[in-house]
Every structure is written in C-alpha cells, then in structure tokens.
A protein has these predicted regions:
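Positively charged, small/polar-rich N-terminal and surface patches that mediate targeting and assembly
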Residues: 411-415, 430-589
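Glycine- and aromatic-enriched membrane alpha-helices
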Residues: 2-465
Length: 589
C-alpha cells in the first residue's frame, strides 16, 4: 500500500514538473526577444520585440486550430501526420491539456528562431504569415514523425528535446529566409563585377540585454530538456549534461576567439553558450558527462565557423547568428546521439535505442540519426521555400530601402524610439561603427533619395520653426563633414557664390584607423576621423541650392558622409556699420 502511494505521488510530482517545464520554455520567449534585440540596432528593437510576441500569439491560434492535431493526433498516411481532430473543442473533458500546452511552447520556439536571422529588413505582415505557416503545418508534421508516434519514432530515431525537430528546423527556415531576403543595406561591399570585397560589421546596440537573454534562455533550457524526465536520476543527469555542454562550448569559444582575433569576443561567446545548449538537446538523456563535454567543445568551434562561413563564403546576412547556433548545432547534436549514447546514462533504457559509435554500439544508431536529419531537412527546405516564395511574389518579404534605413520601429510600428526618454534612435543612425558603411551606390545622381539622406542627412529647422520665429529670408547653414572633404566643399560653395564661411575643426574621438577591432569575426571600422564644421549665412542664394550642392559634393555612397543643419536667422547686425539683415550681408555672401 505504501509503495502504491509513493508511486502515485511520484507520478503527480512529475506531472506538475512537466507543466513547470512548459512554463520555463514559455519564459524562453523573453530570452529570445532580449538576445535578438540586443544583437541588432536600436532603431529596430521594438520591431524585434513585437515579432517575438507574435510568434506565441499567432502560434497559439494556429496550434489549437490545426497544429496540435497534426502533431498529437492518431497516425494517418503511415505515420506521416496526425489525423485532424477538434477534441479540444468537442471532447474537452477528456482532453490531454498538459501535452497541448507543452508542445505549444515548443512550437513557438521553432518559429521564433527565424526572426533573428531575418531581422532589420523583413515586413511585419510577411513575418506574421510565415510564422503562422511554421506553427500550423511545418513544425507539427515533422514533430509528429519523432514525438507523435510517426515513422521516425517507429524506426528508432532519437531526439529527446529538439535539436532536430526544433532547432535544425528553425535554423533551416532562418537560412532560407535570410538568403531569399538578401543582406541588410551596406552589409557587403561589392566591386564592379558584383564580387564581395568587404564584409561590414553591424554591432548590436546592447550586449547587456543580449547577455540577459542568454541567461534567461539557459534557465529555460532546464525545462526545455528536463521537463519530459519521469524519474529523478534521469532528471539529474539531464540537468548535468545541459550544464556541462554549454559551459565547455563557451570556454572553447573564448580560447579560440582570443587566439584568433587577439581578444575574447563577447557576442561570439554568448552565441557559443546557446550553441552548446542546442547541441546537447537531442542527446541530453542518453549521454554522460564526457560525451556532453565533447559535444560542447565541438559546438564552441562550430558556431564560430558557421558565423564566419555565412559572412565570408555564403554571404548570408544573419544578424544574430541563428543559422550557426540552431541549424549547424541542431544537426551536430542530433548526430551526437549516434556517437555518444551510452547505457550508463539513466535515460538510455527508456529511450530504447542503440549505443553510440564511440561507446561500442557501431553505426546502427548513427545511420538512424542521419536518416532522420535528412528526411526532416528535406521537408523543411521544400515547405519553407514554397512559403517564402509565395509571400515574396504576393505581399513581399522585404521592407523598402527607405524604411530599412530609417528603422522598422518607426516605419512599421510608428514608434519614434523603443527607448522613450533616451536619444538612442537618433544616436543609432550616427554611431561610429555605422559610419563609412557602404550604401551600394557611389553615384549621387543614381542614388535613391533614401540613400542620399542616409549619406548626407539634412535637418531644416527653418521649415520646422516656420511661423514661430521672425522670418527674414536669411538662413544659417551648418555643415559637418570629414576633414578630408574641406577643400572640395569649400570650392563647391565658392563656385556657388557663397564666400563667407566660418570653419571649425571638431575634435574626433574613437579608435584610430589601423587598429584591429573585431566583432563576431568581422573587422570593424571604428574610426571617427577628424571632422570640420562649416557655417555660412545665406540670403540671396536660395538655401535649397546650398543644400543640394553640399549633398552632391559630400556624397560618396557611405553612411555618415556629412550632416547639414539649416536654421532661420531672425536678425543680423554688422557691428562696424550698424547695418542689419540683408544689408549687413552684402560683402559677406
């Protein structure tokens, strides 16, 4: 009798833990939001947060309508999918509420992986559509193959918590999406033949927030990997491997980036922690501490290689490293089951699989793992490519050039800034690291208005203050540009007829050119060259001609070529003669 009571209590405890684990996985959405927003620029932070929210909102709706039954329903078509049912509406009394919620939060994780790789240039409406497709069709069907009693489960394929079903699938969607979408403006500089000659770094605006996101994700991962455990030894072992793998991955990445780039790369190490977590997700129940350490070590190197390969070989712009973290390490973690599965792990007996190659089990399990990866990858590539293609040909995937340059917070959501009360939005557009970023068109006459404005920004206070100050028709034009442009702009203004120019050299700050600074393996141009400020007061020459002349002269096709400020002048007095306004300027202009 006592044993029966203890068994019943044990079952109830793990049933509660199962739901606590689901809550921890839900909390991971906050981690993804923090990571992605921290790794991207401030002008898109609100957009990133909104997309991470929509993953769960849209995913929940899609899940109870169709996704849950496709994954959890009885096998149809020889285990290809679950049968469509509406038990959540028609048979609620006998419905498996816990399984519904637990698998829902996993589904949301798959969808949210994609947003980081496609950040800063994707239409919000398009994002909502493909997020819905992933949650309704792509994830539920392939997850059924492994976790819903489908053909992969029957074959002996093993993915305990989602290296394959969640992370590889999300990573493949991210890769194809980023590739079809194209890079952010200025990420890659190309020569006349179209060959990439330089890769530019776009550092995230807040690594502190990104680090917080990593810690939130790591905490959530204990639920992600551990929630399905049904006994204490297995749960303890899962917690151990889930701790060891990311720790080793981060240390290996630290050492490698320190040796390769001269300094340990903060953002790369943050990615390495996540890479180790992704890789250990599939084998966490069937491997031991040694296996977890090796899996983590490979992850720490794989994430660095993946980010480098995307930047320098594939030329796929992935702002947060989602492809390297999730796709590559999802594949590696799934393969690792066939290498490091051992009968000494508490969860091995429950898994019902063969031991790994390195533990005397031969190639049997490894072949099953490779087969599962291949089938799942093929399904994902085909379905997400069709999805993105249809979206691209209908509502479009990418925002306009002007919207991208201004920032999606403003253009997609009407937010002047995600940081109300702080001038981060304005600062982000003129950050040192963004200066000299190529806009893709060096000819002023061929450049779009958005590129012209990004290169030489104009703030016309005469128009803004019209009606609030005395209008004399006199304007002060202030031009801030690089010191090297002085002779060129001086001659252009002189040819225009502007001769009275006040010039001030502005003290630059930052790291001098030639210093080797790296961000995620990409060399940064941290230089803020000495600048000059030119001030002219014009009355007879139309101010628009002065602005246009300055813009055309300063434009080189890169962000930060110059800034122009125009202020209305309410009174001018020549001290020597007492002349005022127009008369005071006759021998100056």
């Amino acid at each position: 009798m006592t044993q029966e009571i203890l068994s019943a209590l044990d079952g109830e405890v793990f049933a509660v833990w199962f739901l606590i684990g689901a809550a921890l996985v839900f909390w991971m959405q906050a981690g993804f939001a923090m990571c992605e927003s921290g790794f991207t620029r401030a002008k898109n932070a609100g957009n990133i947060i909104m997309k991470n929210l929509m993953d769960f909102w849209i995913g929940t709706v899609m899940w109870f309508i169709i996704g849950a039954s496709l994954m959890l329903g009885d096998n149809v078509m020889n285990g290809f999918a679950g049968g469509i049912s509406f038990d959540v509406f028609t048979n609620y009394k006998n419905f498996d509420y816990s399984a519904f919620v637990f698998n829902l939060v996993f589904c949301a994780t798959t969808a949210t992986i994609v947003s980081g790789a496609m950040a800063e240039r994707t239409k919000f409406s398009s994002y909502c559509v493909y997020s819905a497709v992933i949650s309704a069709i792509i994830y539920p069907i392939e997850a059924h193959w492994t976790w819903g009693g489908g053909f992969l489960a029957q074959w002996g394929f093993h993915d305990y918590a989602g290296s394959n079903c969640i992370h590889m699938v999300g990573g493949i969607c991210a890769l194809i999406g980023a590739w079809m979408l194209g890079p952010r403006i200025g990420k890659f500089e190309r020569d006349g033949s179209g060959k990439v000659k330089k890769v530019n770094a776009f550092p995230g605006h807040n690594l502190v927030i990104a680090a917080l996101g990593v810690f939130i994700l790591w905490l959530g991962w204990y639920g992600f990997n551990g929630a399905a455990a049904t006994d204490v030894p297995t749960l303890g072992s899962v917690f151990l491997t889930t701790t060891v793998a990311p720790a080793v991955a981060t240390v290996v990445c630290l050492i490698f980036t320190w040796a390769k780039y001269g300094k340990p790369d903060v953002s790369m190490c943050l990615n390495a922690s996540l890479a180790g977590l992704v890789a250990i997700t599939a084998p966490c129940d069937v491997t031991d501490c040694f296996g977890a350490a090796i899996i983590g070590a490979v992850s720490g190197l794989l994430v660095v290689f993946g980010i480098w390969f995307n930047d320098y070989k594939a030329h796929v712009d992935d702002p947060v490293g989602a492809v390297a973290v999730h796709m590559l390490n999802g594949i590696w973690g799934t393969i690792a089951v066939g290498l490091f599965a051992t009968s000494t792990a508490p969860g091995f007996a429950v898994a019902g699989i063969d031991e790994g190659l390195f533990y005397g089990g031969g190639f049997t399990q490894l072949i099953k793992q490779l087969g599962g990866i291949g089938v799942t990858a093929l399904w994902t590539v085909v379905t997400i490519t069709i999805t993105f293609f249809i979206i691209k040909k209908t509502i479009g995937l990418r925002v306009s050039e002007e919207e991208e340059i201004v920032g999606l917070d403003s253009t997609e959501h009407g937010l002047p800034s995600a940081y109300s009360g702080f001038a981060i939005m304005d600062i982000s557009n003129t950050m040192d690291v963004n200066e000299n970023t190529n806009l893709g068109e060096a000819d002023y006459d061929k450049a779009s208005e958005a590129k012209r404005n990004a290169s030489v920004h104009v703030e016309n206070m005469s128009e803004t203050l019209q009606g609030t100050v005395m209008q004399t028709g006199i304007n002060k034009v202030v031009i801030i540009t690089k010191l090297s442009m002085y002779d060129k702009i001086k001659k252009a203004l002189n040819d225009l007829g502007v001769t009275g120019i006040t010039v001030t050299q502005v003290t630059g700050c930052g790291i001098q050119k030639g210093s080797s600074q790296m961000y995620r393996g990409v060399e940064m141009d941290m230089t803020l060259l000495p600048k000059i400020k030119l001030e002219v007061v014009v009355s007879q020459i139309p101010v628009d001609r002065v602005i246009e002349t300055a813009k055309k002269t300063l434009y080189t096709g890169k962000i930060g070529d110059g800034k122009i400020f125009v202020y209305p002048v309410s009174k001018v007095v020549k001290i020597r003669t007492g002349e005022e306004d127009f008369a005071a300027l006759q021998d100056v202009e």
